[in-house]
UniProtKB/Swiss-Prot annotation:
Enzyme Commission code: 4.2.1.3
UniProt gene name: ACO1
The protein's assembly and partners: Interacts (when associated with the 4Fe-4S) with FBXL5. Interacts with frataxin(81-210).
Organism: Oryctolagus cuniculus
Example of a GO biological process term: tricarboxylic acid cycle
Superkingdom field: Eukaryota
Binding residues for substrate: 86, 205-207, 536, 541, 699, 779-780
Name of the protein in question: Cytoplasmic aconitate hydratase
Family annotation (Gene3D superfamilies): 6.10.190.10, Aconitase, domain 3 (3.30.499.10), Aconitase, domain 4 (3.20.19.10)
GO molecular function: 4 iron, 4 sulfur cluster binding; aconitate hydratase activity; iron-responsive element binding; metal ion binding
Annotated compartments: Cytoplasm, Cytosol
Catalysed reaction equations from the record: citrate = D-threo-isocitrate
Length: 889
């Protein structure tokens, strides 16, 4: 179909008439010039892709008229330029694509129509675990184990890169997806098919937002939604409000980018930005490097926004040059963005656009801080950490409480490790990990950690041998500058050897703790601590034996590792005493900003980025040696425990089946607030007594071969058994933490999977009751696929995290929301009732539907299908069914 906005296309350079761009200034500059820069990107994509069908003329008018329409809950389409995947979410996406090809063929269509039509990059970074640490060969041993465990998955992904066009694999050992995206994959501006246009993307990882720090609009979506984008379907989204975040002033010399982002995270959680964009402006932004901006943008999911945007400016351009991008392309990037009104001068207030609301932060008010012990938004000043932890010890069980009786606050347990005696108590640090894309992409905090390590070693300090220390950089560039600057030996001396290039501890791949440490923690019932430079610290995520976990900057991770406890006041108490009997305080070894900047200027150089990235796709010999078939249809191996054809499309026909009312459903689980996708579908270790473990054992596997839930996402039988299998799940039916529930007809307490299986055998539909922020955390599509396979037809919650709600929609599971001011408690719901949810034939977005109980009580709930497109997916039984029917016709 012809584009009605073709008249806006003109050459960027008269000397190159074949290279055009859509000049949005011609639309209506009085409105366009007032739009937030992030909304301008949405507008450009809509104008360029307008076909009067998927993207209509009225969509462009609605976006251009954002000042009015932002308050009207209006749906607009967005076609991102590309998609990125990581392997934990990428494997199920490729499994779905393979199964969809089978389904299209079965329905009489051309299976090769199932193929990405936009560029797709899949970065393998989630599989490696910290099995070995504190030894020079840790990296090689962990990488060898990664291949041993994941060979079948990797062969499958290699098949996918051959079978599907436009799919590129970045092999294991290359780095973390978001740092590789920032340093290498990001185009900033596309030059394709004769047009320049802004780079934009969605990714199957919630921290995809990190790229917004470079001025590339992107955010995390569920794997199901990403698959639809890959097949050419636009994302259907409610036109977001945009919160302007003004930064002023300069940070204190002791403050790191981590401190700034933890402060912003707490602030924006309080402001309330769920479902909104945040766009930064003000003189303070110019003080921040791209690495600092990327750190702030990375934590976007932790404060609940959809995207956190830093428009491109001179600092962005310098970063592109610094990271080895082609200088002629960088000039074109600047020229295009200036021509289309998307290049920013943060010192010029006349460029400040209109915002829905403006909030601000003076950077000089930020103090060194951590976040924890169970949520990233629970910021604690470093000066208050000791007092805060001791308060949490005795507080009621909750986000800030462990309910330890006062007479047990000083409990301790001695143990023998490597022939020496040590003592653990509440607050003892047993994991200290410099990890995650959030911080390892930032040279200032990484070099700061290295310089602190050097000073600590020079002062005679060390880390106790039982503390599990690790360094997992986000790319080879980090190792390069740590080695070249001479700080790597000091990090190694304190136990922070490079253990792998990947997410590792941040996603729960922290590996085992020493057995004597685990015994001391469990026998003493101690609240042990993990300290990590990550972005999430939900209970049970980092390690099953660390009940308290704090997010901190890399230098503070080392400081707490040396101290050995979180119960320390750094101002008043020494980090330790050296062999000479001298007390050494944190202030004695903390590097100055000038020291860090001098080292950064000398060692973080373009040649380093070029050397690392020019061989990134070919340097891994183990990956190169993998064999993979070249068939267009995947040959499923019935004996495989990693890759299995999913049951989602088994009974699919071309005929639509309209949604039906849910009649006499039982409640499988009665949950509270902030149930995360980690609770719903854990990514970490498979417990030996779990339904998933029984499944694997029955197939002849030993516990050593179980691997993790995340690595098993290509097998629906394991993932269904792993649904709600988190040992920290708090189900109100039981009033204790356990991956169990009550089978209401019999009154038996069973594992969640076993209870769901029995309900399904009895022919009973199921629902889940929940509180606020249901599904927060990772963009985990199995947190929707798993409940679907358990027979859960609907979830009734007070509110949903954005990505999880869209994943439920994508699977045809109905997200219901209590009316404002209502919840399970106010309505007197126990969860032991039977629920009938009336789904009318004339269903409309966000319609109020009736819920009837077998007690005779009735109430209204909002059906959270927010757009007409989402209702179309419901009528098809989910988004993938819709795409298969579309491709098979």
């Amino acid at each position: 179909m012809s584009n009605p906005f073709a008249y806006l296309a003109e050459p960027l350079d008269p000397a190159q008439p074949g290279k055009k761009f859509f000049n949005l200034n011609k639309l209506d500059y009085s409105r366009y010039g007032r739009l937030p820069f992030s909304i301008r990107v949405l507008l450009e994509a809509a104008v360029r892709n307008c076909d009067k069908f998927l993207v209509k003329k009225e969509d462009i008018e609605n976006i251009l008229n954002w000042n009015v329409t932002q308050h009207m809950n209006i749906e607009v389409p967005f076609k991102p330029a590309r998609v990125i995947l990581q392997d934990f979410t990428g494997v199920p996406s490729v499994v779905d694509f393979a199964a969809m090809r089978d389904a299209v063929k079965k329905l009489g269509g051309d299976p090769e129509k199932i193929n990405p039509i936009c560029p797709v990059d899949l970065v393998i970074d989630h599989s490696i675990q910290v099995d070995f640490n504190r030894r020079a060969d840790s990296l090689q041993k962990n990488q060898d184990l990664e291949f041993e465990r994941n060979r079948e998955r990797f062969e499958f992904l290699k098949w996918g890169s051959k079978a599907f066009r436009n799919m590129r694999i970045i092999p294991p050992g290359s780095g973390i997806i978001h740092q590789v995206n920032l340093e290498y994959l990001a185009r900033v501006v596309f030059d394709q098919d004769g047009y320049y246009y802004p780079d934009s993307l969605v990714g199957t990882d919630s921290h995809t937002t990190m790229i917004d720090g470079l001025g590339v609009l992107g955010w995390g979506v569920g794997g199901i939604e990403a698959e639809a984008v890959m097949l050419g379907q636009p994302i259907s989204m409610v036109l977001p409000q945009v919160i302007g975040y003004r930064l002023m002033g300069k940070p204190h010399p002791l403050v790191t980018s981590t401190d700034i982002v933890l402060t912003i995270t707490k602030h924006l959680r309080q402001v309330g930005v769920v479902g909104k964009f945040v766009e930064f402006f003000g003189l303070g932004v110019a003080q921040l490097s791209i690495a600092d901006r990327a750190t702030i943008a990375n934590m976007c999911p932790e404060y609940g926004a959809t995207a956190t945007f830093f428009p491109v400016d001179e600092v962005s351009i310098k970063y592109l040059v610094q990271t080895g991008r082609d200088e002629s392309k960088v000039k074109q990037i600047r020229k295009y963005l200036q021509a289309v009104g998307m290049f920013r001068d943060y010192s010029d207030p006349s460029q400040d656009p209109d915002f829905t609301q403006v909030v601000e932060l003076d950077l000089k008010t930020v103090v060194p801080c951590c976040s924890g012990p169970k949520r990233p938004q629970d910021k604690v000043a470093v000066s208050d950490m000791k007092k805060d932890f001791e308060s949490c010890l005795g507080a009621k069980q909750g986000f800030k409480g462990f309910q330890v009786a006062p007479d047990h606050h000083n409990d301790h347990k001695t143990f023998i490790y490597n022939d020496s005696e040590f003592t653990l108590s509440h607050g003892s640090v047993v994991i200290a990990a410099i990890t995650s894309c959030t911080n390892t992409s930032n040279p200032s905090v990484m070099l700061g950690a290295g310089l602190l390590a050097k000073k600590a070693v020079d002062a005679g300090l060390n880390v106790k041998p039982y503390v599990k220390t690790s360094l997992s950089p986000g790319s080879g560039v980090v190792t390069y500058y740590l080695r070249e600057s001479g700080v790597m030996p000091y990090l190694s001396q304190l136990g922070f050897d490079v253990v792998g290039y990947g997410c590792m501890t941040c996603i729960g791949n922290s590996g085992p703790l020493p057995e004597p440490v685990v015994e001391a923690i469990t026998q003493g019932d101690l609240v042990a601590v993990g300290v990590l430079s990550g972005n999430r610290n939900f209970e049970g995520r980092v390690h099953p034996n660390t009940r308290a976990n704090y997010l901190a900057s890399p230098p503070l991770v080392i400081a707490y590792a040396i101290a050995g406890t979180i119960r320390i006041d750094f101002e008043k108490e020494p980090l330790g005493t050296n062999a000479k009997g001298q007390q050494v305080f944190l202030r004695d070894i903390w590097p100055t900003r000038e020291e860090i900047q001098a080292v950064e200027r000398q060692y973080v150089i373009p040649g380093m980025f070029t050397e690392v990235y020019q061989k990134i796709e070919t340097v891994n010999a183990s990956w190169n040696a993998l064999a993979a078939p070249s068939d267009k249809l995947y040959l499923w191996n019935p004996k495989s425990t990693y890759i299995k054809s999913p049951p989602f499309f088994e009974n699919l026909t071309l005929d639509l089946q309209p949604p039906k009312s849910i009649v006499d459903a039982y409640v499988l689980l009665n949950l509270g607030d902030s149930v995360t996708t980690d609770h719903i579908s854990p990514a970490g270790n498979i417990a030996r007594n779990s339904p998933a473990a029984r499944y694997l054992t029955n197939r002849g596997l030993t516990p050593r071969e179980f691997n993790s839930y995340g690595s098993r996402r290509g097998n629906d039988a394991i993932m269904a058994r792993g649904t709600f299998a988190n040992i920290r799940l708090l189900n109100r039916f039981l009033n204790k933490q356990a991956p169990q529930t009550i089978h209401l007809p019999s009154g038996e307490t069973l594992d969640v999977f076993d209870a769901a299986e029995r309900y399904q055998q009895e022919g009973h539909p199921l629902i889940v009751l929940a509180g606020k922020e249901y599904g927060s955390g990772s963009s985990r599509d199995w947190a929707a696929k798993g409940p679907f396979l358990l027979g859960i037809k609907a979830v009734l919650a007070e509110s949903y995290e954005r990505i999880h709600r869209s994943n439920l929609v994508g699977m045809g599971v109905i997200p219901l929301e209590y009316l404002p001011g209502e919840n399970a408690d106010s309505l007197g719901l126990t969860g032991r009732e039977r629920y009938t949810i009336i789904i009318p034939e004339n269903l409309t977005p966000r319609m109020h539907v009736q819920v009837k109980l077998d007690t005779g009580k009735t109430f209204q709930a909002v059906i959270r299908f927010d757009t007409d497109v989402e209702l179309t997916y419901l009528h098809n039984g989910g988004i993938l069914n819709y795409m298969i029917r579309k491709m098979a016709k």
